[in-house]
UniProtKB/Swiss-Prot annotation:
Family (UniProt): Belongs to the AP2/ERF transcription factor family. AP2 subfamily.
UniProt source species: Oryza sativa subsp. indica
Protein name from the UniProt record: APETALA2-like protein 2
Keywords noted in UniProt: DNA-binding, Nucleus, Repeat, Transcription, Transcription regulation
Bias type Pro residues, positions: 72-87
Upper classification of the organism: Eukaryota, Viridiplantae, Streptophyta, Embryophyta, Tracheophyta
Region (Disordered): 1-116
Annotated gene: AP2-2
Motif Nuclear localization signal per UniProt: ranges: 106-115
Basic residues compositional bias, start-end: 104-113
Length: 434
């Protein structure tokens, strides 16, 4: 008996088959047929070319030997391609990931569609309950109007897009639907066409009227008024018998305040803009307000200001002398009349007192010409007064509010007695004009 272990294929490593060769009677001494018998037993698994299960007897010629062959040749092992020396392994992995990434479609320059509508340029507003249409032009959003349906708002957007951007514009519907509009919009500017679209919208009307700025008053007449302007909630324009009259009154006021860019109910060309009065001359604006920043100067020739014309009165009080009053009326020559015990002073000794003069307490007051008040003596210490003023005293600069220069002054005669040192904290004061 001969055992033969053969490996049939590389994929089935570890799988072997054993064959038992019985050649005991190969010389012709066995039972029946003179040919040698070959018996093969599979211990683990059978090869694909075995037709029957293990234990089946295969009759092979005696002269043939056992042949082991491989049906499918093994594929050669794939060697990994080496990465370039200048490229790191991580960079190669990133390039491979980018190559497998799907290509994203490029966005259009018109912007994304509206989230609240399936149409471009249409948005639904819950506060108003309308579909409003807008279009972007030169970085600004232009309002086209409010509509009851999204379809009508989309139509308005398409017309504006064709007018603003030409036939290559991105629109919601086909271009052939707007052939009639193309013929009409050639004669209009962008502003005029936007006004036409707004007038066609349902959001253009306010109140219970189809015209802008017109409402039905409770008295049965039509009221015209403008919205927020000059910090006011609204401006009342009046009551009219018909809607058209009220609408035209609103149009005139809108053109007056907003110029040629005003949104009107009718064509702005139907109004004579040059003949309309200015906004400052109308009763609806506070025209009496004078906002100029300036200081008003009184008129000296006015009868009211003549009563308040003031002069300068100088009163000097001392225990041993009577009141000394210096007064100059407005409009006369700058000569001061000084009364000292009913005796006028010589003009060569006319001087004004400084703030620290000895022996006198100056009291400059502004009084009207027709009312001359006599002031009582100022309180002084009870001690005896002895003073001797110098013959020449420095000039006193007049107050800025009195209107007199330093040269227009009057002097007081020098006293013959000496006074004790007088306190220096006695400034001039100017009480308000009566």
């Amino acid at each position: 008996m001969l055992l033969d272990l053969n490996v049939e294929s590389p994929e089935r490593s570890g799988t072997s088959s054993s064959s038992v060769l019985n050649s005991g009677d190969a010389g012709g001494g066995g039972g029946g047929g003179g040919g040698g018998g070959l018996f093969r037993f599979d211990l683990l698994a059978s090869s694909p070319d075995d037709d029957e299960c293990s234990g089946e007897q295969h009759q092979l010629p005696a002269a043939s030997g056992i042949v082991t062959r491989q049906l499918l040749p093994p594929p050669p092992p794939a060697a990994p391609s080496p990465a370039p020396a200048w490229q790191p392994p991580r960079r190669a992995a990133e390039d491979a990931a980018l190559a497998q990434r799907p290509v994203v479609a490029k966005k259009t320059r018109r912007g994304p569609r509206s989230r609240s509508s399936q149409y471009r340029g249409v948005t639904f507003y819950r506060r108003t309950g309308r579909w409003e249409s807008h279009i972007w032009d030169c970085g600004k959003q232009v309002y086209l109007g409010g509509f009851d349906t999204a379809h009508a708002a989309a139509r308005a957007y398409d017309r504006a897009a064709i007018k603003f951007r030409g036939l290559e514009a991105d629109i919601n519907f086909n271009l052939s639907d707007y052939e009639d509009d193309l013929k009409q919009m050639r004669n209009w500017t962008k502003e005029e066409f936007v006004h036409i679209l707004r007038r066609q919208s349902t959001g253009f009307a306010r109140g219970s009227s189809k015209f802008r700025g017109v409402t039905l008053h409770k008295c049965g007449r039509w009221e015209a008024r403008m919205g927020q302007l000059l910090g006011k909630k609204y401006i009342y324009l009046g009551l009219f018998d018909t809607e058209v009259e009220a609408a035209r009154a609103y149009d005139r006021a809108a053109i007056r305040f907003n110029g040629r860019e005003a949104v009107t109910n009718f064509e702005p060309a139907s109004y004579n803009v040059d003949a309309l009065p200015d906004a400052g001359n109308e009763a609806i604006v506070d025209g009496d307000l004078d906002l100029d920043l300036r200081i008003s100067q009184p008129n000296a020739r006015d009868s009211k200001s003549d009563v308040a014309t003031t002069g300068l009165q100088l009163t000097c009080d001392s225990p041993e002398s009577s009141n000394i009053t210096v007064h100059q009326p407005m409009g006369s020559s700058p000569q001061w009349t000084v009364h000292h015990q009913s005796t006028p002073l010589p003009p060569q000794h006319q001087r004004l007192y400084p703030s620290h003069c000895l022996g006198f307490l100056p009291n400059l007051q502004e009084r009207p010409m027709d009312r001359r008040l006599e002031l009582g003596p100022m309180p002084f210490p009870t001690q005896a007064w002895q003073m001797q003023a110098p013959s020449h005293l420095p000039l006193l600069h007049a107050a800025a509010s009195s209107g007199f220069s330093a040269g227009a002054g009057a002097g007081v005669a020098a006293a013959t007695r000496r006074q004790p040192p007088f306190p220096a904290d006695h400034p001039f004061y100017f009480p308000p004009t009566a």
